[in-house]
Amino acid sequence: MKAALLYEGKAKKVYQSSEDEHQLVLSYKNDATAFNGEKKSQFEGKGRLNNEISSLIFQRLHEAGISTHFIKRLDSTQQIVQKTSIIPLEVVIRNLATGSITKRLGIKEKVSFTPPLLELFYKDDALGDPLINDEHALLLTDITETELAEIKDKAREVNAALQEIFQSIGIKLVDFKLEFGRNKDGEILLSDEVSPDTCRLWDIETNEKLDKDVFRQGTGDLITVYQEILNRLEVHV
């Protein structure tokens, strides 16, 4: 199913599909990184968990009418997706205050954002993925004002759908990051992944962290909390 390796990132390898030039094979790795790659480790089974979690969530997003690059899960660690040209922006949606924004703006932990706060970051490892505004986004990428508005609207739609999904399994969607890309027809699709690597997820009852923060902060076992997310999704999704 896969041919040449096109790109290797922190969490996935991207291969050209051997069966369709407009499709890719994403292979999820067991690597975990934090603090822009300064903290690194490997966890047996992490790639499988993220692949299964992201596949389930993309399926639910499709059911909610949201266009994504996801086609199907190929095996335990791989999925087939539409080939997209990734737009070098990370779109972050924050429903509750935690992490960098509390330090950057002095906002108290767990403050609720109503409406949810949307932030843009420029994807550039050398620059540390800086926070940017709309005008920066138009300057630094090839997107138009109309496309930027579309990306923001899609991100908010994804947030609403994800909040419903996670609330149904007893989890608060605190914040998350998204990436978008254009397919061969120029359609903007949600790309990359949606998993505990890219979302902050807290148990509704206990506020226990069920995401990569347990690795960042050294407060728990990553595989245990990722498996908990998958278990809940498999029962309720």
Swiss-Prot record:
<comment type="similarity">
    <text>Belongs to the SAICAR synthetase family.</text>
</comment>
<dbReference type="InterPro" id="IPR028923">
    <property type="entry name" value="SAICAR_synt/ADE2_N"/>
</dbReference>
<keyword id="KW-0067">ATP-binding</keyword>
<dbReference type="GO" id="GO:0006189">
    <property type="term" value="P:'de novo' IMP biosynthetic process"/>
</dbReference>
<dbReference type="GO" id="GO:0009236">
    <property type="term" value="P:cobalamin biosynthetic process"/>
</dbReference>
<protein>
    <recommendedName>
        <fullName>Phosphoribosylaminoimidazole-succinocarboxamide synthase</fullName>
        <ecNumber>6.3.2.6</ecNumber>
    </recommendedName>
</protein>
<dbReference type="GO" id="GO:0004639">
    <property type="term" value="F:phosphoribosylaminoimidazolesuccinocarboxamide synthase activity"/>
</dbReference>
<dbReference type="InterPro" id="IPR018236">
    <property type="entry name" value="SAICAR_synthetase_CS"/>
</dbReference>
<dbReference type="InterPro" id="IPR001636">
    <property type="entry name" value="SAICAR_synth"/>
</dbReference>
<keyword id="KW-0547">Nucleotide-binding</keyword>
<comment type="pathway">
    <text>Purine metabolism; IMP biosynthesis via de novo pathway; 5-amino-1-(5-phospho-D-ribosyl)imidazole-4-carboxamide from 5-amino-1-(5-phospho-D-ribosyl)imidazole-4-carboxylate: step 1/2.</text>
</comment>
<dbReference type="InterPro" id="IPR050089">
    <property type="entry name" value="SAICAR_synthetase"/>
</dbReference>
<keyword id="KW-0436">Ligase</keyword>
<dbReference type="Pfam" id="PF01259">
    <property type="entry name" value="SAICAR_synt"/>
</dbReference>
<keyword id="KW-0658">Purine biosynthesis</keyword>
<dbReference type="GO" id="GO:0005524">
    <property type="term" value="F:ATP binding"/>
</dbReference>
<dbReference type="InterPro" id="IPR033934">
    <property type="entry name" value="SAICAR_synt_PurC"/>
</dbReference>
